[in-house]
Regions:
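Juxtamembrane intracellular "pre-TM" segments in multi-pass secondary transporters
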Residues: 1-3, 187-215
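Extracytoplasmic gate region of multi-pass secondary transporters
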Residues: 27-28, 210-264, 320, 324
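Helix-to-loop junctions at the C-terminal end of transmembrane segments
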Residues: 60-71, 263-276, 362
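Cytoplasmic membrane-interface "Motif A"-like loop-to-helix N-cap segments
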Residues: 69-80, 271-286
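C-terminal ends and interior cores of transmembrane alpha-helices
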Residues: 81-95, 287-300
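Cytoplasmic helix-loop-helix junction between adjacent transmembrane helices
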Residues: 103-144
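Helix-loop-helix hairpin linking two adjacent transmembrane segments in secondary transporters
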Residues: 137-184
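C-terminal transmembrane helical hairpin of 12-TM major facilitator-type secondary transporters
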Residues: 276-323
């Protein structure tokens, strides 16, 4: 019975995560018709994507506190409901550049609670030895979304337009939110917090932890190429490499497939064979991913680009899963929402910086060479910054309690 309950919860959280990632995937392809409709400059397109992650970053830590205070189920449902509502507004009411920015910002605010509440749900319902695999299943939804998302996005853009695509996505988010509300059991009650001062102590100590800081930087660097490619790869392939939109969706889908496979395999492999050696996994995979990302730019063949992007995302996701699951092994449950909020804020800041920085680089250089150099460099940094964790023994009781 417990296995069935956990399986149902993971399935629903997985579908919700997929909706969240499809929302971010569709934007990259929707920028092409949006650019034509509003006659936008490259840096303005970057802001449409980046402002989503700005809101995501701002509300990430408050969302972690809400998880610790009110429970993961309420935050899960609220996040999907807000994300769906503002996705619909983006499609139906986004008639000016300012409104597009506003609705994407508000959607990012809604999205902020979902990753931390999923991490809280996994921590509360799974033993330590199963958490890496359970979380990797949820993170693999990114691969599913990036595999099917480009294909679905191009189909929807061609048949119902970018406005109808976002409206449909919002309806799906509403449906999944209702299913979670109805089918996922309520979390066990914990003792109420007696005062704000008592709750603030773990936050201050977590912010001083060198391990939390290093994980924050690593996630920041890893998400720059992840979200930067998600936002700009379709435009690069169509306008710079001259590929049809349908072919560019297949190239992007190859990267998503690599991400999906890697997230599932990495969770099992690291959880079973590489306990305590995660820094080696992160460093080696980050360097290999940097090489593959550089080769995506160097090739002019759609098949070669698909192959390099596939392996680039295989190694990138291996690094990401290893970094993202480390706090679940080292931190106590009562501060998990807060810790994941802090660390994941690094990732969302990477998502904010990446599309805007790439937009300015494209405009200033009138090309994409400098943008890919930027992606390669931050990928290398993500691997090197994790090396100081080698040999460290982290005690959550001493550092975070």
């Amino acid at each position: 019975m417990q296995f069935q309950r956990r399986s149902l919860m993971i399935f629903l959280l997985f579908i919700g995560y997929a909706i969240v990632y499809i929302d971010k995937t569709v934007v990259g392809f929707a920028l092409l018709p949006i650019e034509r409709e509003f006659s936008l400059q490259p840096e303005q397109l970057g802001y449409i994507t980046g402002v989503f992650f700005l809101a995501y970053s701002i509300f990430q830590i408050p969302a972690g506190w809400l998880n610790d205070r009110f429970g993961f189920k309420k935050v899960l449902c609220s996040s999907l409901f807000l994300l769906g509502g503002f996705a619909m507004c983006f499609g139906w009411l986004g008639f000016t550049f300012g409104l597009l920015l506003t609705f994407r910002f508000l959607a990012g605010m809604g999205h902020a609670g979902y990753p931390t509440s999923c991490a809280k749900a996994v921590t509360a319902n799974f033993p330590v030895e199963q958490r890496t695999f359970a979380q990797s299943i949820l993170l693999s939804s990114a691969g599913l979304a990036m595999t099917l998302g480009p294909l679905v996005a191009v189909y929807c853009l061609e048949h119902i337009g970018w406005r109808g695509s976002f409206a449909s996505l919002g309806i799906l988010a509403f449906i999944i939110s209702g299913c979670i509300l109805w089918l996922v059991p309520n979390p066990q009650r914990t003792l109420p917090v007696s005062s704000p001062q008592q709750q603030s102590v773990p936050y201050r100590q977590l912010l001083k932890s060198p391990i939390v800081i290093l994980l924050f930087i690593a996630i920041f660097c890893l998400n720059i190429p992840s979200y930067g490619l998600m936002a700009w790869l379709p435009k690069f392939l169509v306008q710079n490499r001259g590929l049809p939109l349908g072919v560019s969706s297949l190239v992007a889908a190859a990267g998503g497939l690599g991400m999906w496979i890697s997230s599932l395999c990495t969770g099992y492999f690291v959880g079973k064979y590489m306990q305590g050696k995660e820094h080696k996994v992160v460093c080696s995979c980050s360097l290999l991913s940097a090489v593959c990302i550089g080769l995506v730019y160097a090739t002019s063949s759609a098949i070669s680009a698909s192959l390099f992007l596939f392996f680039g995302y295989v190694f990138l996701m291996a690094s990401f899963v290893s970094v993202f699951t480390l706090p679940m092994k080292r931190l106590p449950t009562d501060v998990m929402g807060a810790a994941m909020g802090i660390i994941n804020t690094g990732g969302t800041l990477g998502g904010f910086v990446a599309p805007i920085a790439m937009g300015y680089l494209v405009k200033m250089s009138q090309g994409y060479f400098s943008t890919f150099v930027f992606l390669v460099v931050v990928m290398i940094v993500s691997g090197l910054v994790i090396l100081p964790l080698a040999g460290k023994t982290y005690s959550p009781v001493r550092e975070a309690a």
